[in-house]
Amino acid sequence: MTDKIRSVQGRVVSDKMEKSFVVAIERKVKHPLYGKFIRRTTKLHVHDENNEAKLGDLVEVRECRPISKTKSWTLVRVVEKAVIA
């Protein structure tokens, strides 16, 4: 059995929790009738053991065993730090 572990990239939209954050995954879907590409976002709750990710960071996350009711993803790495303006 060769199960591939899912890994995705997204932006951190909330980091107010301890050892957790929310990441928004954006994808483009073609409208079934009109053919226009529409942006769809999915929010995932991610486990962050060391509180590395901050608001606005681009992060890579992967699927894991369920950690809580809503958390089943863990942080792999911070791809790009947020620019503080």
From Swiss-Prot:
SUPFAM superfamilies: Nucleic acid-binding proteins. Pfam families: Ribosomal_S17 (PF00366). InterPro entries: NA-bd_OB-fold, Ribosomal_uS17, Ribosomal_uS17_bact/chlr, Ribosomal_uS17_CS. GO terms for cellular component: cytosolic small ribosomal subunit. Keywords: Ribonucleoprotein, Ribosomal protein, RNA-binding, rRNA-binding. Belongs to the universal ribosomal protein uS17 family. One of the primary rRNA binding proteins, it binds specifically to the 5'-end of 16S ribosomal RNA. PANTHER family: 40S RIBOSOMAL PROTEIN S11 FAMILY MEMBER, SMALL RIBOSOMAL SUBUNIT PROTEIN US17M. Part of the 30S ribosomal subunit. This is Small ribosomal subunit protein uS17. The lineage of its organism: Bacteria, Pseudomonadati, Pseudomonadota, Gammaproteobacteria, Pasteurellales.
